[in-house]
């Protein structure tokens, strides 16, 4: 558990700069590509989507533009604050909660889709996070993960 607190402290320290990078990325080809991926993958209208490890809120802005009901979680309180600010500025209605991806506080089968980007490499127990993602995913739901250690 100590390791996850160190990770939280690291991302709390980097939240402001990371948030600025996300703001710029939303304007790039990357944002357009992700919108295309989500449009072609999450085909249910008004799907309930969990962004597991939202960071500064890149995915939820795109998903809300597509009409989905989005819940965004992150363990870093500074990241969730940056994400909430971004959603307000974008006019995106997103529920934001601080939460550990390895111990999701949602009922089984709560979401039509779960998305996650660059989160799993940060975790003490990525397998637990995978199990949790599957647990909260409804039957026939979509799981979209993009991950890699970029540092």
Locate the predicted segments by residue.
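Class I SAM-dependent methyltransferase SAM/SAH-binding core
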Residues: 50-103
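Short N-terminal helix/helix-N-cap motif within the alpha/beta-hydrolase-1
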Residues: 78, 123-128
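A short SAM/SAH-binding and catalytic strip from SAM-dependent methyltransferases
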Residues: 113-125
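A short acidic, Gly/Pro-enriched loop at the edge of an enzyme's catalytic core
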Residues: 102-113
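Conserved class I S-adenosyl-L-methionine
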Residues: 1-45, 58-62, 82
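A short hydrophobic/small-residue beta-strand
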Residues: 70, 143-144
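A short glycine-rich, Lys/Arg-flanked "PGG" loop and its adjoining helix->strand segment in the class I
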Residues: 127-139
């Amino acid at each position: 558990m100590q390791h996850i607190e160190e990770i939280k402290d690291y991302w709390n320290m980097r939240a402001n700069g990371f948030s600025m990078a996300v703001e710029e990325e939303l304007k790039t080809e990357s944002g357009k590509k992700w919108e295309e991926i989500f449009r072609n993958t999450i085909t249910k209208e008004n799907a309930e989507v969990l962004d597991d490890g939202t960071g500064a809120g890149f995915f939820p802005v795109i998903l809300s533009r597509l009409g989905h009901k989005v819940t965004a979680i992150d363990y870093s309180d500074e990241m969730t604050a940056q994400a909430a600010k971004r959603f307000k500025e974008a006019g995106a209605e997103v529920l934001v909660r601080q939460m550990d991806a390895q111990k999701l506080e949602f009922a089984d089968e709560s979401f039509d889709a779960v998305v996650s980007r660059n989160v799993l490499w940060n975790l003490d127990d990525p397998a637990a996070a995978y199990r949790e993602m599957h647990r909260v995913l409804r039957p026939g739901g979509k799981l979209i993960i993009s991950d890699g250690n970029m540092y």
